[in-house]
Amino acid sequence: MAQSEYLFTSESVSEGHPDKVCDRISDAIVDAFLAEDPHSRVALETMATTNFVVLAGEVRGPDSLTHDRLKEIAREAIKDIGYEQRGFHWKDAEIVSHVHSQSADIAVGVDAAGNKDEGAGDQGIMFGYACTETEELMPAPIALSHAILKSLAEFRHGGDTSFGPDSKSQVTLRYVDGKPVGAASVVVSTQHAGNLSQDEVRELVRPHVLKVLPEGWMCPEEEFYVNPTGRFVIGGPDGDCGLTGRKIIVDTYGGAAPHGGGAFSGKDPTKVDRSAAYAARYLAKNVVAAGLAEKCVIQVSYAIGVSKPLSVYVNTQGTGQVDEQRLAVVLQQLMDLSPRGIRQHLQLSRPIYARTAAYGHFGRKPEKDGGFSWERTDLVAGLKTAFGA
């Protein structure tokens, strides 16, 4: 039986969080390869700690992207985020590259040849989700958590020196009859200038929270937590070691939907961990946008070297207006879910990934250059026609 009233929480982390610094660097390198050769293969991991960055992974692409060029790309990403502190500075951080060529065994099993279609780059399961809680058809807790941190980042990039790049947010919403009605608590931890007190930071953060929450949704004052430890001056990779791919729930639905376990950043779009998760979101969003359900979970699965998905599962969580099995069939008629089909349909072989590395891969606006193409709702007409809606 569904609960009539409950609390649900999601968190976000900023572009300056140590793990997000690594995601940004990894995706900037993916973009660099795709910009020169859209057929590049990239699996790039980054580690960042006190003034030290390690690049590692496997690539196949243009020779112009040397180790020195990869280091430059990493440095540019750190600069763009805004790190100019003693323990982590874009100018003098030591950056080493241990990137090497992709395994020939993987290439043979995955690449298309002759009459053989391109196979998936690995086995795995991927999920997509959409719901009617926000205009972006995203769960409200993660959408609001992202929005708070984006507001802080815009303030900082505008020239204010009160905040540092590293911050986190967490929003707990109260639900009644399955709908969010207000915030029960809000937590914001943000790196700040050393001369600011906790109370001063609290009042600087407050307007960014109020701007984001719908009117009347602000939590009780005693449930509004800003820097609960009292001080947050040392931040970023100088405070905690960062790694690519460690914020997969922040990147997706904030825990409101299942996750297959595969991270996105650092992977070119032939990797189904990334491309199939984007496709699953695209399909789920179109189902909800078409009015066929208020909630939609889609799971797809793949095997390495096999071009078609092994399974496609649709669950509208009791909100559907149509048969779920038929919906799964129709979705596969509207979109080729082979790795190549996904990449072509969503035009993913473009340098569009660095921008995804912070504030969520989903719930963003489609961009003219093809960025966030998986947020389009151009299947709505086809779905309505198929179901006579």
Swiss-Prot record:
Q: What class of enzyme is it?
A: transferase
For this UniProt record, give its keywords in alphabetical order, as a comma-separated list. Answer: ATP-binding, Cytoplasm, Magnesium, Metal-binding, Nucleotide-binding, One-carbon metabolism, Potassium, Transferase
- Would you tell me the Gene Ontology cellular component terms? cytoplasm
Q: Where does K(+) bind?
A: 45
What is an example of a GO molecular function annotated in this UniProt entry? Answer: methionine adenosyltransferase activity
Q: Which Gene3D superfamilies match?
A: 3.30.300.10
| GO terms, biological process | one-carbon metabolic process; S-adenosylmethionine biosynthetic process
Give the residue ranges for region: Flexible loop: 102-112
Write out the similarity annotation: Belongs to the AdoMet synthase family.
Listed name of the protein: S-adenosylmethionine synthase 2
Which species?
A: Rhodospirillum rubrum (strain ATCC 11170 / ATH 1.1.1 / DSM 467 / LMG 4362 / NCIMB 8255 / S1)
